[in-house]
């Protein structure tokens, strides 16, 4: 069956222009970025934004450092460019200065830490009280260069780098192990593009840990976190053990009999890998990443999500809750604007990026507190309950 991809609700502005060769991106470290931005507050906003759009980070920048750098920028354009720069590097390793040289734990110590993670996830999902929070999402998309059929002929539309396509602020409720979004606000509120993610409050944690226990978990490194030393495990999950569906809307399936395409959603369970960053004493997960194992030639060539967690004070008590997430999806365009569909056409890769911040937490219902758990006496870590709520990974779907 021949497939043709249709990107629905693609947002962006196109300006006819002659094709131009893009200048190579300058690769910089976090330390070099800090040096470049040391005097940014004295320069025009647009100038700093232009400078940031021409560089690429070679390592991840911490949220604390990102917040500090944003505060020193002259305006919203530069701040947006910095967020795009930082989020694009969210799945990279940390700067060398944040990697600690402490010896790796022995097998017994590593197993005890893994047991602590499992206990923490089980207690978090089962005993997290009913909460409400505001999820602020900024959606970014780029626009690949393409030839467009206009009224007077074919014109080349210049490529556009990642840019904001919308923002939304919706109330999210975590209740009875289920994450519920205010659908009315989603329907009538501002749109942020087509990338949708949910499940940060617990389902992602339980599903990744359960899958990782069926896959491969290895020691990563010690890192310097906000509160001191944190530990990192690497994990890899094969497709036969995976519960990670990559979803994309929409694909044209051409009917060989009448030539009329049937629109369907592309969905595939994929193998994936990532990192679990945690407090070695309590097992509390502070950061988790998921990256699908996809090849550059596939319909969807990249999909991933990173979620950060931190202590939030709610009604006088502290709970570990989501504070930030970054999700990304890359897919090939297959529908040329203003032109007839080509059954074998495969265009450039288009990127969708969501930056999400959680805040304004409030609590209702039970007085139950989160328990962090410890290693216990169990010799075999037990995975999270299969009753845990499912999550929705990064997906490009039609927004109504």
PLM feature spans:
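Helix N-cap / beta->alpha transition motif
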Residues: 29, 277-279
């Amino acid at each position: 069956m021949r497939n043709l991809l249709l990107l629905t609700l693609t947002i962006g502005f196109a300006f006819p222009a002659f094709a131009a060769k893009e200048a190579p991106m300058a690769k910089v470290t976090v330390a070099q970025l800090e040096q470049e931005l040391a005097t940014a507050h004295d320069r025009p906003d647009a100038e700093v934004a232009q400078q940031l759009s021409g560089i690429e980070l070679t390592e991840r920048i911490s949220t604390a450092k990102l917040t500090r750098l944003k505060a020193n920028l002259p305006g919203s354009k530069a701040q947006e460019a910095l967020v795009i720069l930082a989020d694009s590097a969210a799945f990279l390793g940390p700067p060398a200065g944040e990697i600690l040289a402490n010896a790796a734990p022995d097998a017994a110590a590593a197993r005890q830490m893994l047991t602590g993670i499992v206990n923490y996830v089980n207690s978090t999902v089962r005993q997290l009280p009913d909460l409400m929070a505001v999820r602020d999402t900024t959606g970014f998309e780029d626009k690949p260069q393409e030839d467009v059929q206009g009224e007077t002929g074919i014109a080349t539309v210049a490529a556009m780098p990642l840019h904001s396509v919308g923002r939304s602020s919706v109330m999210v409720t975590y209740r009875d192990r289920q994450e519920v979004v205010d659908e009315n606000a989603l329907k009538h509120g501002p749109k942020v593009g087509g990338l949708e993610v949910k499940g940060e409050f617990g389902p992602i944690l339980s599903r990744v840990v359960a899958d990782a226990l069926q896959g491969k978990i290895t020691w990563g490194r010690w890192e310097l976190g906000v509160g001191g030393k944190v530990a990192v495990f690497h994990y890899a999950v094969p497709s036969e053990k995976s519960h990670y569906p990559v979803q994309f809307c929409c694909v044209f399936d051409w009917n060989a009999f009448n030539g009329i395409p049937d629109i369907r959603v592309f969905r595939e369970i994929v193998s994936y890998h990532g990192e679990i960053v945690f407090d070695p004493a309590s097992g509390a997960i502070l950061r988790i990443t998921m990256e699908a194992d996809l090849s550059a030639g596939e319909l969807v060539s990249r999909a991933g999500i990173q979620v950060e967690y931190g202590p939030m004070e709610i009604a006088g008590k502290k709970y570990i809750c989501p504070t930030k997430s970054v999700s990304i999806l890359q897919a090939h365009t297959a529908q040329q604007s203003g032109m007839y569909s080509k059954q074998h056409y495969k265009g450039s890769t288009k990127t969708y990026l969501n930056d999400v911040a959680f805040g304004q937490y409030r609590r209702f219902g039970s007085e139950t507190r989160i328990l962090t758990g410890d290693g216990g006496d169990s010799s075999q870590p037990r995975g999270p309950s299969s009753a845990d709520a499912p999550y929705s990974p990064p997906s490009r779907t039609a927004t109504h």
